[in-house]
């Protein structure tokens, strides 16, 4: 491939990166306009048995687009950082603690803002060539996990012990599955010279989504929707 072809390739890639960013921002705004019940597999109903609890736990991180985007970013960062597996572990453990804090009626303010900001932050981290060390990112992942877990706890608050434990098991399992799948695929494809440009492209998309999520969360704080 000659120099002219290289320039054409990078220009095309830049255009697609920008289009992906603009598209993700628009998509994020549309998704965040959905009602809060979109994060609940059973709407506003509390699970009453093991199966309902487990399936609700699996569904919440998948149908909550802000949660899924962050879990995806955790898997990507874990793949490109040295000893990055600890980033995933810290998030999963902290999310369980966050859910437990909610169930224990501990008050954590700004949960939606924290969840949205975490997507933006990890998207930005993916775009950086010189990232903070793994220990710092592990700490950030744990803090984010507390916010995400606290948000998960809202769906199961008031449930009996069996569906509650099943719910905790469900969202823990699905988070591990998603992060490990992204981690494994990224380890395979994000290697050598491909790591930086592909990682940056993914980071731009996630940053765009995070920005959209955060803008919507701020708007909901300033102009809260009426309940009922």
Describe these PLM feature segments:
Residues 199-220:
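Final/C-terminal transmembrane alpha-helix of multipass membrane proteins
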Residues 54, 58, 92-96, 113-116, ...:
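Residue-level signature of the transmembrane alpha-helical core
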Residues 68-78, 126, 137-145, 151-160:
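Generic transmembrane alpha-helix signature in multi-pass membrane proteins
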Residues 43-50, 106-113, 150-171, 216-227:
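Interfacial helix-loop-helix junctions of multi-pass membrane proteins
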Residues 75, 79-112, 161-190:
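A small-residue-rich subset of transmembrane alpha-helices
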Residues 2-62, 218-228:
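Histidine-/acidic- and/or cysteine-rich, low-complexity loops and terminal segments associated
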Residues 38, 64-67, 120, 146-148, ...:
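Divalent metal-coordination and catalytic microenvironments
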Residues 183-206:
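Interfacial loop-to-transmembrane junctions
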């Amino acid at each position: 491939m000659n120099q002219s072809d290289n320039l054409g390739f990078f220009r095309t890639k830049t255009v697609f990166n920008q289009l992906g960013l603009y598209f993700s921002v628009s998509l994020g705004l549309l998704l965040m306009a959905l009602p809060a019940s979109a994060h609940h597999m059973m709407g506003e109903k509390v699970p009453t048995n093991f199966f309902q609890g487990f399936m609700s736990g699996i569904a919440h991180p998948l149908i909550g687009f802000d949660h899924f985007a962050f879990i995806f970013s955790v898997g990507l960062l874990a793949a490109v950082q040295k000893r990055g597996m600890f980033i995933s572990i810290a998030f999963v453990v902290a999310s369980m603690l966050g859910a437990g804090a909610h169930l224990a009626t501990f008050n954590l303010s700004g949960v939606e803002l924290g969840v949205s900001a975490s997507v933006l932050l990890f998207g930005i981290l993916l775009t950086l060539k010189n990232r903070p060390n793994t220990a710092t990112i592990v700490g950030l992942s744990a803090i984010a996990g507390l916010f995400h877990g606290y948000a998960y706890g809202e769906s199961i608050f008031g449930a009996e012990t069996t569906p509650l434990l099943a719910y905790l098991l469900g969202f823990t399992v699905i988070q591990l599955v998603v992060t490990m799948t992204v981690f494994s695929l990224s380890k395979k494809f994000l290697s050598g010279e491909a790591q930086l440009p592909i990682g940056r492209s993914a980071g731009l998309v996630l940053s765009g989504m995070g920005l959209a999520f955060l803008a919507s969360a701020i708007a909901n704080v300033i102009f809260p929707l009426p309940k009922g």
